[in-house]
Amino acid sequence: MALLIHLKTVSELRGRGDRIAKVTFRGQSFYSRVLENCEDVADFDETFRWPVASSIDRNEMLEIQVFNYSKVFSNKLIGTFRMVLQKVVEESHVEVTDTLIDDNNAIIKTSLCVEVRYQATDGTVGSWDDGDFLGDESLQEEEKDSQETDGLLPGSRPSSRPPGEKSFRRAGRSVFSAMKLGKNRSHKEEPQRPDEPAVLEMEDLDHLAIRLGDGLDPDSVSLASVTALTTNVSNKRSKPDIKMEPSAGRPMDYQVSITVIEARQLVGLNMDPVVCVEVGDDKKYTSMKESTNCPYYNEYFVFDFHVSPDVMFDKIIKISVIHSKNLLRSGTLVGSFKMDVGTVYSQPEHQFHHKWAILSDPDDISSGLKGYVKCDVAVVGKGDNIKTPHKANETDEDDIEGNLLLPEGVPPERQWARFYVKIYRAEGLPRMNTSLMANVKKAFIGENKDLVDPYVQVFFAGQKGKTSVQKSSYEPLWNEQVVFTDLFPPLCKRMKVQIRDSDKVNDVAIGTHFIDLRKISNDGDKGFLPTLGPAWVNMYGSTRNYTLLDEHQDLNEGLGEGVSFRARLLLGLAVEIVDTSNPELTSSTEVQVEQATPISESCAGKMEEFFLFGAFLEASMIDRRNGDKPITFEVTIGNYGNEVDGLSRPQRPRPRKEPGDEEEVDLIQNASDDEAGDAGDLASVSSTPPMRPQVTDRNYFHLPYLERKPCIYIKSWWPDQRRRLYNANIMDHIADKLEEGLNDIQEMIKTEKSYPERRLRGVLEELSCGCCRFLSLADKDQGHSSRTRLDRERLKSCMRELENMGQQARMLRAQVKRHTVRDKLRLCQNFLQKLRFLADEPQHSIPDIFIWMMSNNKRVAYARVPSKDLLFSIVEEETGKDCAKVKTLFLKLPGKRGFGSAGWTVQAKVELYLWLGLSKQRKEFLCGLPCGFQEVKAAQGLGLHAFPPVSLVYTKKQAFQLRAHMYQARSLFAADSSGLSDPFARVFFINQSQCTEVLNETLCPTWDQMLVFDNLELYGEAHELRDDPPIIVIEIYDQDSMGKADFMGRTFAKPLVKMADEAYCPPRFPPQLEYYQIYRGNATAGDLLAAFELLQIGPAGKADLPPINGPVDVDRGPIMPVPMGIRPVLSKYRVEVLFWGLRDLKRVNLAQVDRPRVDIECAGKGVQSSLIHNYKKNPNFNTLVKWFEVDLPENELLHPPLNIRVVDCRAFGRYTLVGSHAVSSLRRFIYRPPDRSAPSWNTTVRLLRRCRVLCNGGSSSHSTGEVVVTMEPEVPIKKLETMVKLDATSEAVVKVDVAEEEKEKKKKKKGTAEEPEEEEPDESMLDWWSKYFASIDTMKEQLRQQEPSGIDLEEKEEVDNTEGLKGSMKGKEKARAAKEEKKKKTQSSGSGQGSEAPEKKKPKIDELKVYPKELESEFDNFEDWLHTFNLLRGKTGDDEDGSTEEERIVGRFKGSLCVYKVPLPEDVSREAGYDSTYGMFQGIPSNDPINVLVRVYVVRATDLHPADINGKADPYIAIRLGKTDIRDKENYISKQLNPVFGKSFDIEASFPMESMLTVAVYDWDLVGTDDLIGETKIDLENRFYSKHRATCGIAQTYSTHGYNIWRDPMKPSQILTRLCKDGKVDGPHFGPPGRVKVANRVFTGPSEIEDENGQRKPTDEHVALLALRHWEDIPRAGCRLVPEHVETRPLLNPDKPGIEQGRLELWVDMFPMDMPAPGTPLDISPRKPKKYELRVIIWNTDEVVLEDDDFFTGEKSSDIFVRGWLKGQQEDKQDTDVHYHSLTGEGNFNWRYLFPFDYLAAEEKIVISKKESMFSWDETEYKIPARLTLQIWDADHFSADDFLGAIELDLNRFPRGAKTAKQCTMEMATGEVDVPLVSIFKQKRVKGWWPLLARNENDEFELTGKVEAELHLLTAEEAEKNPVGLARNEPDPLEKPNRPDTSFIWFLNPLKSARYFLWHTYRWLLLKLLLLLLLLLLLALFLYSVPGYLVKKILGA
């Protein structure tokens, strides 16, 4: 569907100049090219094309403007041509020559010649002439099929055609045809038509023709992006998406988990910090740490909530650090940090991991940073799957500044700001007292006062403030402001403003409004601070009639959708950044309430009179409970129209009209004569007359409106802020269009329709056009006086965003290719989210409209329509989407009544026409109604024709027949206790309903029934009904023999309409069957496959209707089957069923299942399994494979479900249903023959080589260890040999495509001469844990690499095309290759040694694979050939029951299916190895019972849910398998939430009887039963029989001894031989040494192995292992084998379904008992910490600050002592003796500390075992970082000692001490200078000077002293051999320090005293005096000797 404008010439122009033309239609403009130096005539000759999605209306306009073009100044308008398209719509082709008009609408001489063509998509108007635009008839057919191909990019300016070049016709046709048909279509030469204009630039077309001629797919060529589709391809519009049940407000389960790891840089001296974690009102505390500014906690807290999402996300998470908290005192707050839960939930994975929270003091905002707390915060809702980063081996090397606990985009330095919430006044409050109380009051007081005492309360960031109470006022006036102080930007998204009624007993909320700060601010470069109003906000809540116990009170609190207007509040908000340096600033963050400056009445906008009109065209589906009393519908807007409980006052003052208003109305609208002077004569009519409903069927009633449709109209007065709503509407229109397009594309991808990329281009084109249109429309009314600052800023922001979005859409459009559709679709989803966000206007104006159904004057059900959706504008884009349209509304119950099953029934379905606009625009209010009515006025008489009608009488009506083709449904809701249902469908259309037949006991009914609705009368014009037919409602019910039918779900559809004059032929008819999603509340409840057509009955009656030609072979009596042409085309398929066995069958009616059988049914055909004679003894079937043939649709999407039912055969021929399962999609079981058209191997190899050269950085030389693909002469795939070489000197793991220098950095088994600088780890020192931690490092690094690249599944699919070529590269190695490549880049960019340091540190250790998830998710549930089907019984639970599908599972059927078309081609059946016994199921092992040794290794658990009151748990492992139940209760781990178990358990089991392994974690309790924390279940049987060989993981290397010993009893060569035999693969052929050939692959590798004694022996195991690790590359039989691994499984608790209770790391090995016995289990017991002794000698101190003043002299001195500890102040604190009266800050100690400790090297943690409190039963193990704390103190005799300074040394990495005190600086400790870091565990002995620091008054670090210390680390054995004494004691005592004797007395030692008191203080003064004295002496000598000398000189002596 498109409109083409051919602009030919503009003539009679005046003067010479450059001309340009602008052509505008529907707001989208195209410019012509500039014609230079035109004189009289401008010959444009250009064609412009508009793809139009909706039919062109006959009233639409086309506008062409001609300008004089200027490069410098703006273009000057010459004239305008406007044309109404009525004639074009009727005739499809018009050519016009006409004059232009100027600005004043005066005709000018200049004329224009234009040709206009239009073709509607439905063919109702016009068709292209044979030779017009597309010449080829077949091409026209294709054009019709694809419906739309857009040929022109918006804004592209085609150049005019030079003579002699091909015409548009040929070029355009070849482009369109080539684009659409690709290589299947050849181009035909066409005769040239000289009069055809150019549409595309010729150069482009020539390039295009060259590119397309190559036979490539056109959509892979960038120039092909000119093909775009703007009309819907899928029939998505026929599926209206209507959600019935309110989702907001329903409580859900949430879990907030917070791990407090540590704190750093806490401000304060010698503090004892405790961290308090608050979520909402719940508080939890960590333990207290003494005397440290950087405490380490690692404590985990969990908070559980069951509340609605809105309440949850507004809760505040507060993390505070408190100093010296104990039982008696609450402690002093150091600092706190807060954010709301919603901020955390909106993060990726709903969590912050290892982030630092910045602490600030709320009581002193000028004090700055108070420290950091490192924590993990996660918020989990039910069903959320969170990827938790791995817990093990956390290092505390942290970049604090780069990892702050802040959402992305929030600056790290947040400033304090004041939030001023200004509350002005409120209006329209409801009365808040019962009428009884009101009468009592009146009796006592004697006057009727307003029955409400309102005040406003504001909640923000955990604080609240409230205004004063205005006594007895429905229209209170406050003019107050509530001031909050918080950091900006705040981490709390919403502010809650609530009007409350003050009451003696308890205050009640009247209404609530939430201010979303993101919507009233912008954080961009050109953004603005939050600002709002002054603007009115509307509040909604419960109905206005006051009752003491209001069941809907929650609605007034803002929970759930309000059902009635409550009040409106005039408020404003402003934010001011605070200058914290200002001395006058109040530094507290307490909420203040101040007076605010009053504002004028007109500030919020000029009051205008609005007019709302509505017409009820139909009211049906009225719930039968309301069917016995007359029903009326009431429409309200604000309090207007509410006659029951609306206005609190009887009279509302009319807004005064300004004097000029009347004249203005007179002039513009000529309305005043019609309205009899005063509009007050026009009384509002807000409700329909009461009418008694009539029966539709047993559930529903309808109102018999017939041709008389009741109307309502309401006048109301509101501030005129339409511009806000207009802008929101434009964006909504763009967003709706975009959403429709994206849904269409997703449907295309889902249903595999061709060319989704073309549709996406069309969507992007429409988006960019919409954005341009917004920019042109939104900038109106700039000078509006009542525009707030937010209006102005939002407009600028929206215009910037949409301009940017339009540009991005244009760029994306050019980039769309077939393989990038999914990526670009995601980007478009982001556009959609942004548009929806921008369109949500935060400043309200007109309240929403409520439609209430009243029965017996009581409110029953309601619908709410946003006013902006109904707002009228003369500009189409600004009009609300439902304005002047007939809208279908489904009325629902208010508040909580609408939850659950009560909300599923429709209360009423109303077809309603609504229009809202200014009274001045009232003449338009009937413009959208279906035509053919007469108005009925309320009053008669002259001058009343402008009065609105009270009802409409329709004289025009159309007769229709509806055919509902109900084919089948699938995955329906189980409504009976058997787990099945007896479903039937009821179809409602207008006032009629019909039912399908009932099908018993199925969840996938195939009704195959056509329902015909005759004698349907629809009112209005036929073409209107064609475009927008009424909605069909389909409800599915379960037939019950007793009681009424149970509701199972509902869906909606729109029929395809055929008019009487239309042919019933393709492409529109007959309609295609489609799936409609069935909803039950908000949950999906299956799919309905159906089609609906609405056929107009013409003058000839039903004879003209298409005949019903059903299948002739079936006679079903009165039931008409779906006719041919609509029912699917069937083909014969064979369904093979593998019956393996049944598992875990539960009792039926208390009786055990003994003789079960499985029945398989599909499309009426089926097969039964053999009977299991004794389920207890052997639950497997003895006949494995059976098959049946069935007719299935050709289209796989329409395949019916396959039903699996298990019955128990009882005595006397009875049988009982045990459970059932419906396979809703057979797709994954369909066998597809291999594709012979796969690209040839030559191409593959060529690509592979290219990949390798790229990966090797361009070098084509092959480094050792890479895969070399060589070609043998034979071409077929099977014969290709792949060489995988592995030299003895190279790695034991093939790393493919990795350059040599990267290889050096990888893990190796054997050392090489390549890396002399890297030490080999001593194998005797390594254990399994070394391997585990090395593997975790690798996993973490891989995850880190994946984060920035963000490869997700879709992208992975695309990458696979090339990745698949990379021979033997497994997933793990791919990731590692990428990791190494990235690391190499970062290192080369780094400098020298520093960048290589991390690489050198990593030792060469063999690794295993650590999976951060279950093994099943990595290997497709091990369902490679054996599938597990859960059998269900019992009713499906509803959300509110909290029941899950788990509870309905009564057993499992194991088997498989294979579906294929018959007969199979011979070559296919030969290649697939088809067998007459087992069919397609080849190589199936026997299912006889087998004994297996199961070995379970449980490594550790993480993040367990606390089970005890103290917030901890005492976990132990429990394992169940069959009858074996192991409880490892004795080895529980005390008070741990991250316990390391390190256990292995051996269990002998017999498959199939014992195949479900349960590993549970229990909490040990001293008293009472132990509680289950969580459990995980593993199906061992599927693992055992899987081709992935999950019995025992394949290790990375083969070793016969050491930590990496081979675990499997079978060696790699034996495993390889077995696999080749089972898979019928040729091989393995070993030899020569180090070489093996399997099928057509050759692997080479080391041929020797070293035994325990270091002897080298020849072996084939290395190459065999290499072949196993690349088994997926073996043709046909190859698949990925499970590597040696540890899997991480979530722990779940049945009591808390859907929420993880922690994670468990484990792996399972299985060994058949008939094979050689495996070796002893691996020892994975937790590493015992190693005992060490740290000896610290404190030699001296220097430059210690002097704290004490001497009593006599005032001299400064200090009594210094040094304190140190390693584990904690309480555990091992040690003090030196005191150096008294240090006058210089120098202290001499020679004092030794001894710290024995237990240390875990792998985790770099010290292990402490101690009782948590005196009441604790046992010791708890703690792990803390190895940090030595040294403090310097000033000793006082009477008062407490004074803390002077401290340093904390991390023993793994601390700065090397300075050699002298002078070289020791403060920067060594603060990290401001690069100091070499040392580890005491490597150096063993370190001596030096270290600085001691403390914070001054400004919270800045200052140097308070230096300490000379020596650290010496010994193991416990070494310490025992070489003992030393504590302090200065024996053995090996230290000598006494040589301290100056400062305990002197003046008169005994005056000189010494003088030295200390005078010299130290006045030494410089004394030196200067001495120097001066010497100079004076010298001068005196000179003067004394000069005379004598002079005399001698004179006398010449």
Curated annotation (Swiss-Prot):
Ca(2+) 3 binds at residues 1508, 1514, 1563, 1565. The chain crosses the membrane at residues 1964-1984. This is Otoferlin. Residues 1-98, 236-357, 400-531, 944-1069, 1115-1242, 1464-1593, 1714-1865 form the C2 domain. InterPro entries: C2_dom (IPR000008), C2_domain_sf (IPR035892), C2A_Ferlin (IPR037726), C2B_Ferlin (IPR037720), C2C_Ferlin (IPR037722), C2D_Ferlin (IPR037723), C2E_Ferlin (IPR037724), C2F_Ferlin (IPR037725). Interacts with SNAP2; the interaction is direct. Interacts with STX1; the interaction is direct. Interacts with RAB8B. Its cofactor is Ca(2+). Key calcium ion sensor involved in the Ca(2+)-triggered synaptic vesicle-plasma membrane fusion and in the control of neurotransmitter release at these output synapses. Interacts in a calcium-dependent manner to the presynaptic SNARE proteins at ribbon synapses of cochlear inner hair cells (IHCs) to trigger exocytosis of neurotransmitter. Also essential to synaptic exocytosis in immature outer hair cells (OHCs). May also play a role within the recycling of endosomes. Binds Ca(2+). The ions are bound to the C2 1 domain. GO terms for cellular component: basolateral plasma membrane; cell projection; cytosol; endoplasmic reticulum membrane; Golgi membrane; membrane; presynaptic membrane; synaptic vesicle membrane. Ca(2+) 1 binds at residues 976, 982, 1038, 1040. Isoform 1 and isoform 3 are found in adult brain. Isoform 2 is expressed in the fetus and in adult brain, heart, placenta, skeletal muscle and kidney. The lineage of its organism: Eukaryota, Metazoa, Chordata, Craniata, Vertebrata.
